[in-house]
Every structure is written in C-alpha cells, then in structure tokens.
From Swiss-Prot:
Ranges of biased composition (kind: Basic residues): 149-175
Protein's organism: Woolly monkey hepatitis B virus (isolate Louisville)
Gene Ontology terms: biological process: microtubule-dependent intracellular transport of viral material towards nucleus; symbiont entry into host cell; viral penetration into host nucleus
Subunit structure: Homodimerizes, then multimerizes. Interacts with cytosol exposed regions of viral L glycoprotein present in the reticulum-to-Golgi compartment. Interacts with human FLNB. Phosphorylated form interacts with host importin alpha; this interaction depends on the exposure of the NLS, which itself depends upon genome maturation and/or phosphorylation of the capsid protein. Interacts with host NUP153.
Phosphoserine: modified positions: 161, 169
Maturation and modification: Phosphorylated by host SRPK1, SRPK2, and maybe protein kinase C or GAPDH. Phosphorylation is critical for pregenomic RNA packaging. Protein kinase C phosphorylation is stimulated by HBx protein and may play a role in transport of the viral genome to the nucleus at the late step during the viral replication cycle.
InterPro entries, per database record: Hepatitis_core, Viral_capsid_core_dom_sf_HBV
Pfam families noted in UniProt: Hepatitis_core
Family listed: Belongs to the orthohepadnavirus core antigen family.
Keyword DNA-binding found: yes
Main localisation: virion
This protein's name: Capsid protein
Keyword annotations: Capsid protein, Cytoplasmic inwards viral transport, DNA-binding, Host cytoplasm, Host-virus interaction, Microtubular inwards viral transport, Phosphoprotein, Repeat, RNA-binding, T=4 icosahedral capsid protein, Viral penetration into host nucleus, Virion, Virus entry into host cell
Role: Self assembles to form an icosahedral capsid. Most capsids appear to be large particles with an icosahedral symmetry of T=4 and consist of 240 copies of capsid protein, though a fraction forms smaller T=3 particles consisting of 180 capsid proteins. Entering capsids are transported along microtubules to the nucleus. Phosphorylation of the capsid is thought to induce exposure of nuclear localization signal in the C-terminal portion of the capsid protein that allows binding to the nuclear pore complex via the importin (karyopherin-) alpha and beta.
Length: 182
C-alpha cells in the first residue's frame, strides 16, 4: 500500500522530502515541544483536530518503535547487526517521525495554510539557482505577515482607527454643543 500521511492535510511526502534531514529538529526536541504546547489536548479523550490526532498517533508510533529498538538492542548479540538496526531506525524511521512531528506541530502553531505556503516558498527558493535567489531562505515564523498582524491586533491597538475616530467625533460635538449645556 502506498499511503501518504500528509494527503488529507493538503501536502505530500514529496513536498516535505525536499527539505534536508538537518532541517528538522531532533525527535526529543519535537516531543518536548509537542508536550509543552499541546500536552492537554494530546492527553485528552476529546477530539481536538485531525492534526492533534495525527500528532498523537505519531508520538505513540515513536514510543512503540523505541520499545522495539530497545528489545533488539538487548536481544541482538552481534554488535555489527545491532548497529545496522539502530542506524536504519535513526536514519529512516527517525527522519519520517521528525517530518511528521514537525509538520503537525507547525500546522497547529502557525496554521495549515501558512505551513503549506512556507513549504512551497521554500521549495521554490531551494530550486532556484543561487545566483537568482535571495540569500536567505524563507522563515516559517516570519512568512505570514497577516497571521502576525491578526495575533497582535487585540493587544496591539492603542489608538483608535480612523473609522472609530470619525464615528465618535459627532457624538462629542453633540455633547459639547450649547443646546446640551442648557
């Protein structure tokens, strides 16, 4: 079976596979991040979102894979064979788990559309010859200007907008008019 774990989220394995392996943080760092940001939702019996479910399943799979790796490490007597198994798990399975964890944590943190936009921007950047591309790669946290603005609006607005000022001005004039002082 050819199952793409990103398909229902609007991405593909190919879209994530162009990112270099060292792009993704370690599994431990990603698990710590997921725990710090989403522990309550991940441990809840309630369904939060498909990303929470996928993240939960990825964490469980990693745990099972580590149990298997521990068993192999304990029961495989040939050091060369043991090293081969550990290397395979780290290089192949570890990368897939890091990709999955990064994708779902990023989607929960920044929003799916932002992450997909970032992946496409990075894909275009990395495939553009160095002489024709900007020196710095796109950065996920700075890519969506609108997301940053939306997050700042409630606490960041200290002065009323021009529309608000216009609607308040006539009321002030009425209350200060000579007729209201009588």
């Amino acid at each position: 079976m050819d199952i793409d774990p990103y398909k229902e989220f609007g991405a593909t394995v190919e879209l994530l596979s162009f990112l270099p392996a060292d792009f993704f943080p370690s599994v431990r760092d990603l698990l710590d991040t997921a725990s710090a940001l989403y522990r309550e939702a991940l441990e809840s019996s309630d369904h939060c979102s498909p990303h929470h479910t996928a993240l939960r399943q990825t964490v469980l799979c990693w745990g099972e894979l580590m149990s298997l790796a521990s068993w192999v490490g304990t029961n495989l007597e040939d050091p060369a064979a043991r090293e081969l198994v550990v290397s395979y798990v780290n290089d192949n399975m570890g990368l897939k788990v890091r990709q999955l964890l990064w994708f779902h944590i990023s989607c929960l943190t920044f929003g799916r559309e932002t992450v997909l936009e970032y992946l496409v921007s990075f894909w275009v950047w990395i495939r553009t010859p160095p002489a024709y591309r900007p020196p710095n790669a796109p950065i996920l946290s700075t890519l969506p200007e609108t997301t940053v603005v939306r997050r700042r609006r409630p606490s960041g607005r200290r002065t009323p907008s021009p529309r608000r000022r216009r609607s308040q001005s006539p009321r002030r004039r009425r209350s200060q008019s000579p007729a209201s002082s009588c």
